[in-house]
Amino acid sequence: MADDVGLNDLSCYGGDHTPTPNIDALASTGMRFEYSFSATVCGPSRCQLLTGRYPFRTGMNSNKTDTMPLAGTEIMLPSVLKQAGYATACVGKWGQVSWDNRPAPPWGFDESCAFLLSGKYWSAKYYNNNTEKNLANVEYMPDVMHTFLVDFITRKQTQPFFLFYSLVHVHDTMFRTPDSNPATKSINGSAEFYADNIRYMDKLVGQVVSTLNSLNLRNNTVILFVSDNGSTAHYKGIPDTIRGQLIDGWKNTMKEGGARVPLIVNWPGVTPAGTVNHDLTDFSDFLPTLAELGGASLPQGVTLDGTSFAPQIKGQKGNPREWVFVERNGDSYARDSRYKLGNDGLMYDLKNAPFEQILVAATSTDPEMILRRQRLQKILDDHPAMAKTQ
């Protein structure tokens, strides 16, 4: 899982600025999803992905720490997969539920090498299997996390494993990477270092694939690459464009660019190579999808919001969801394959204007518009956004 990487940041989605050859290779030999939706900020997105439940159910509707679910109150994806015999590990950023007992049980991770919050690159604190450590002056957090990842995969290569790899990149503040040109005079946070961080993230993705290949695990391993929310490139003065078209919205907005994120799935010999899937998915779908792929039973006695897209990963039609729901700190919207309705009453026709250029008048007398609005409003009524937290 990348941090703050939007569609515009990846060349396989038409991003105009920095080539991402390793991520592109996953897409060209796997499946790229066009309409995958997160929450608009990291904490709610990650909590939704790991629990299969919308923010109004878990309480995690913002990045406020007092909204984080407490240990033991939610069943998370690693716990589900452990019951099917999987070794589990969390590597990288931890910012979706409380840090009680670190990512160890009851959240379901056997092992962890993680840091709190975001944007930790140099001179920071982290936890290796719950032991607090500090980076040495020359250590780069992404490399430390990656070294742990390679060690875990190597040790667990003879058994099924689930690895939640939460990359540091490309959350602010953008620092120079070990690969940055030493002669670059730009200050931290600059557009030049943004591109460097995109490239370094892409390099790490390529190294994961190389590790799996070297251990002869690649054909038996499903890789899912996704981001936790939309991009922040515009804060650096970098236009959020795809093939020259400006995306409407970015991280922490309810516009299309805030929650529509990259999703690439690659499973050699199973996922049809080079395919583009136009089904709707949202982050509640990951738990049932990975449970199905891993032969695990879904938790009982809990409401799950997700729909498995495991059949689509295998090249089958499956049972695509008809709508997605996105919530952020009192705001929400429901979106189907063509229309989007927010709890502010604004409705958009996205068919020929994918970034919300066409507003559907609330007073429209078109029977189709009335029916579509009613259907989407019913979804919003059935999924009440939590009140805004201060």
Please place each PLM-identified region on the residue numbering.
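Formylglycine-dependent sulfatase
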Residues: 1-343, 350, 354-388
